[in-house]
């Protein structure tokens, strides 16, 4: 993308719901690494009606550049012992937005947002071992590869290995 500074994150609006539903229900958009079969088509509308898709334990923000929708980022709370938690984040970009640096920029923006507005020390992201583009985007965004997770994702009839990444608050300092 020519001007990655124009890529921003913003809350989901009601007008975004058809785009979100289309992305989540399209094997073409979710392929090759995020298609897990059909799922509840009303899930996003119910979440939006409940809390605007900005809940205390999981949330979604749109990735946009001007009026162009590029995809979305999400995060969910992972509780650890003693009331401690961290975030696990993910991304889904439309095919036209891939390979342009948008994923790297979106990961950076979301990590900065979460560290600015929550007291977590750590944010994780994971992807399939064969998703080299996502691994590169995470590394360019400042995430550190921590290890291989064997047989962690069941997709397309078989178990697949994943790769775990993290970024710490001090990594952004």
Regions found by a protein language model. Name each.
Residues 1-27, 60-173:
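Acyl-donor (CoA/ACP) binding surface of acyl/acetyltransferases
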Residues 49-50, 112:
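Surface-exposed alpha-helical segments enriched in charged/polar residues
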Residues 50-62:
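A short helix-loop-beta-strand connector motif used in the catalytic cores of GNAT acetyltransferases and
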Residues 28-49:
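Conserved GNAT-fold acetyl-CoA-binding loop/helix
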């Amino acid at each position: 993308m020519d001007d990655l500074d124009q890529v921003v994150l913003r809350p989901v609006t009601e007008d975004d719901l058809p785009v979100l539903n289309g992305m989540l229900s399209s094997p073409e958009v979710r392929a090759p690494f995020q298609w897990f079969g059909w799922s509840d088509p009303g899930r996003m509308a119910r979440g939006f009606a409940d809390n605007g898709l900005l809940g205390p334990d999981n949330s979604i923000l749109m990735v946009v550049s001007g009026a162009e929708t590029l995809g979305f980022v999400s995060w969910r709370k992972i509780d650890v012992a003693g009331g401690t938690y961290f975030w696990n984040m993910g991304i889904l970009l439309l095919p036209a937005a891939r390979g342009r640096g948008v994923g790297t920029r979106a990961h950076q923006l979301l990590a900065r947002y979460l560290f600015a507005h929550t007291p977590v020390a750590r944010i994780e992201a994971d992807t399939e071992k064969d998703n080299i583009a996502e691994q590169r985007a995470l590394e360019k965004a400042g995430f550190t590869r921590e290890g291989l997770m064997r047989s962690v994702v069941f997709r397309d009839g078989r178990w697949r290995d994943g790769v775990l990444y993290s970024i710490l608050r001090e990594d952004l300092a």
